[in-house]
Amino acid sequence: NEVTNSEYIRIFASSFQIFLRNDYPIFLLMTGLYENIYNLQNDKVLTFLYRAPKLILEPLNYTAIRKQYMDIFSLDIDAAGELASLTKGYPFAFQVLGYLYWENRDKKTLEQILPEYDQYLDEYVYSKIWSELSDLDKKIVTEMSLSGETQVKALRERLDMKSELFSVYRERLKRKGVIISKEYGKVTLALPRFDEFVKIQQLM
């Protein structure tokens, strides 16, 4: 679980490859962030991982999340939909927002819960992600957060970046799970309220 390209994982994976060659009846299931799996399989002695079946997990289904919130909190479809939208299908956000709403449902409005929700995302996830971004990664994400721009061409022009360079960093940010590109020529932030987190970083 949560594998990274560490020395111990490399040793273990190398040993596992030997066990496979000896036809031992063993199986290995690895889970982790896309970027960490990507870096691990690119290790020159672990190329066998390229041939291993991979399942890339998509965000949780919006309709399923909305239904859960409707059932648990006895909400109408619009109120549950508003909650579901705030998670963007991110599992940790789904859990945290559900917990906070349950704890405060009779005391606070959803708007009043958001600061604590943002704090959880910041402390447990976003600060770590932000610390691992390069300066140019941050520059791109900051421009997306402040301007709300999603058109790749417009973003490149705002950032004064050539297409080739922007493409490299777009792929980096996709591997890190920070942005998604579901439509040709467009990119959006993948994480819920990450734009709010980024805006706060500019004030620090």
What are these regions (language model features)?
Residues 93-165:
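Winged-helix-like regulatory helical subdomains adjacent to P-loop NTPase cores
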Residues 159-176, 181-184:
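Short amphipathic alpha-helical interaction segments
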Residues 78-92:
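A short helix-loop-helix "switch/interaction" segment in the helical subdomain of ASCE P-loop NTPases
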Residues 14-15, 100, 172-176:
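Alpha-helical DNA-recognition elements
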Residues 52-80:
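Conserved small helical "lid"/interfacial subdomain of P-loop NTPases
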Residues 1-35, 42-45:
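Conserved Walker B catalytic segment
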Residues 192-204:
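Short, amphipathic alpha-helical interaction segments positioned at domain boundaries
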Residues 185-192:
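Minor-groove-contacting beta-hairpin "wing" of winged helix-turn-helix DNA-binding domains
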